[in-house]
From Swiss-Prot:
Record has Transcription as a keyword: no
Entry's Gene Ontology molecular function annotations: rRNA binding; structural constituent of ribosome
UniProt keyword annotations, A-Z: Chloroplast, Plastid, Ribonucleoprotein, Ribosomal protein, RNA-binding, rRNA-binding
Localization, UniProt: Plastid, Chloroplast
Its job: One of the primary rRNA binding proteins, it binds directly to 16S rRNA where it nucleates assembly of the body of the 30S subunit. With S5 and S12 plays an important role in translational accuracy.
Protein known as: Small ribosomal subunit protein uS4c
This protein's encoding gene: rps4
GO aspect biological process, one term: ribosomal small subunit biogenesis
Domain S4 RNA-binding: 82-143
Length: 182
């Protein structure tokens, strides 16, 4: 995991660790300039590793984004940001996206009062995301919320930390996407 971060730069969804200053790939001499192919491949890999997608899943999202109206890149990022695992990460209910996937897979999360165990579930505006009423589920989320640094919450989400409840207000705005993509 850390090799990927060193190679591609900071991936906030994968881990909170940052590459050290001694491992800066820009300081090392590379032969020749970066080709267009290499730049596109690195950006694709950033998306894959940040959101925890397989190649096939990413291709499906690209296909859906290509059919939609508007900028394909922007629509693709909106689709990826509206996944349930990513919304849990943005709400601070999980420290990383893989941690959020585990919460969903282990059936700790309810969307609109129904258990959802699919991390790629596409959330819609006005969806209410809560934890199961079990003590263990609430304890897991409570630990994540207490230990996570309180970053500014995106406009499209609201959280009630006392009831362990999150609300999707609208589709994400492009300025809140935390990943820098060329």
């Amino acid at each position: 995991r850390f090799k990927k971060i060193r190679r591609l730069g900071a991936l906030p969804g994968l881990t909170s660790k940052r590459p050290g200053s001694g491992s800066d790939p820009k300081n090392q001499s590379r032969s020749g300039k970066r080709s267009q192919y290499r730049i596109r491949l690195e950006e694709k890999q950033k998306l894959r590793f940040h959101y925890g997608l397989t190649e096939r899943q990413l291709l499906k999202y690209v296909h859906i984004a290509g059919k939609a109206k508007g900028s394909t890149g922007l629509v693709l990022l909106q689709l990826l940001e509206m996944r349930l695992d990513n919304i849990l990460f943005r709400l601070g209910m999980a420290s990383t996206i893989p941690g959020a996937r585990q919460l969903v897979n282990h059936r700790h999360i309810l969307v609109n009062g129904r258990i959802v165990d699919i991390p790629s579930y596409r959330c819609k505006p006005q969806d209410i995301i809560t934890t199961k009423d079990k003590q263990r589920s609430k304890a897991l989320i409570q630990n994540y919320i207490a230990s996570s640094p309180h970053e500014e919450l995106p406009n499209h989400l609201t959280i009630d930390p006392i009831q362990y409840k999150g609300l999707v207000n609208q589709i994400i705005d492009s300025k809140w996407i935390g990943l820098k993509i060329n």
